[in-house]
Amino acid sequence: MNTTDSSLLADIREVNLSYLLLAQRMLRQDHAASMFRLGFSTEVADILMRLSPAQLVKLASSSSVLCRFRFDDYGLLSALTQDVLGGALQQAHATILLAKQPVEEIA
């Protein structure tokens, strides 16, 4: 494995660990709101809450990025990037559009 690949894997691991730690912290502070914000099912949220620090590090060491870009629909992404609604209304619109997306579950 070359230096670029090693650096990329280290960056992925860092992003994954940051994401997992943030998700756990969010879930501890406000479980229901965090499940909505993260797009987690109850089962996924419960599993994540039970993970030990060692398990988080092991999971973060995956070569795949664990968080998912939720704006995978072109129409949705373009609608949210247009500055036609303004601040608070734009944020409310984004929340409504995200709420319509199904929660992903670990298969």
Swiss-Prot record:
<dbReference type="GO" id="GO:0003677">
    <property type="term" value="F:DNA binding"/>
</dbReference>
<keyword id="KW-0010">Activator</keyword>
<keyword id="KW-1015">Disulfide bond</keyword>
<keyword id="KW-0238">DNA-binding</keyword>
<dbReference type="GO" id="GO:1902208">
    <property type="term" value="P:regulation of bacterial-type flagellum assembly"/>
</dbReference>
<comment type="function">
    <text>Functions in complex with FlhC as a master transcriptional regulator that regulates transcription of several flagellar and non-flagellar operons by binding to their promoter region. Activates expression of class 2 flagellar genes, including fliA, which is a flagellum-specific sigma factor that turns on the class 3 genes. Also regulates genes whose products function in a variety of physiological pathways.</text>
</comment>
<dbReference type="Pfam" id="PF05247">
    <property type="entry name" value="FlhD"/>
</dbReference>
<comment type="similarity">
    <text>Belongs to the FlhD family.</text>
</comment>
<keyword id="KW-0805">Transcription regulation</keyword>
<dbReference type="GO" id="GO:0045893">
    <property type="term" value="P:positive regulation of DNA-templated transcription"/>
</dbReference>
<dbReference type="GO" id="GO:0044780">
    <property type="term" value="P:bacterial-type flagellum assembly"/>
</dbReference>
<dbReference type="InterPro" id="IPR023559">
    <property type="entry name" value="Flagellar_FlhD"/>
</dbReference>
<keyword id="KW-0804">Transcription</keyword>
<comment type="subunit">
    <text>Homodimer; disulfide-linked. Forms a heterohexamer composed of two FlhC and four FlhD subunits. Each FlhC binds a FlhD dimer, forming a heterotrimer, and a hexamer assembles by dimerization of two heterotrimers.</text>
</comment>
<dbReference type="GO" id="GO:0005737">
    <property type="term" value="C:cytoplasm"/>
</dbReference>
<dbReference type="InterPro" id="IPR036194">
    <property type="entry name" value="FlhD_sf"/>
</dbReference>
<protein>
    <recommendedName>
        <fullName>Flagellar transcriptional regulator FlhD</fullName>
    </recommendedName>
</protein>
<keyword id="KW-1005">Bacterial flagellum biogenesis</keyword>
<keyword id="KW-0963">Cytoplasm</keyword>
